[in-house]
A protein has these predicted regions:
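A compositional/biophysical signature of low hydrophobicity enriched in polar/charged and small residues
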Residues: 1-93
């Protein structure tokens, strides 16, 4: 699984709407509003192939209403078992 963190600047009047629109894009697993940075939102994108990433970010996330600018960071490795636990969980207790 390829994981990317997309830092997003949004027109201040459109932050909630942009966050909702971005959260509904296939491949976007999470969207957070943030403070203390030069960005308004962070989206976590998880896809199987780089071709999907090359479509999701420039053609969908960047074109959501109100988005002004994006910067993308790719994850090389996860040091948390959270993702693995969730991936293999059957939901049985």
């Amino acid at each position: 699984m390829i994981t990317a963190f997309v830092m997003i600047n949004v027109d201040a009047a459109r932050i909630p709407e942009a966050a909702q629109e971005i959260s509904e894009i296939a491949g976007v697993s999470e969207v957070y509003s943030i403070a203390g940075a030069d960005w308004d939102l962070i989206a976590v994108v998880r896809v199987r192939e780089y071709e999907e990433l090359a479509d999701v970010i420039p053609n969908r996330v960047s074109k959501a209403k109100g988005v002004v600018d994006t910067t993308t960071h790719l994850a090389f490795r996860s040091f948390s078992e959270h993702d693995l636990d969730a991936a293999f969980s059957l939901g049985l207790e």
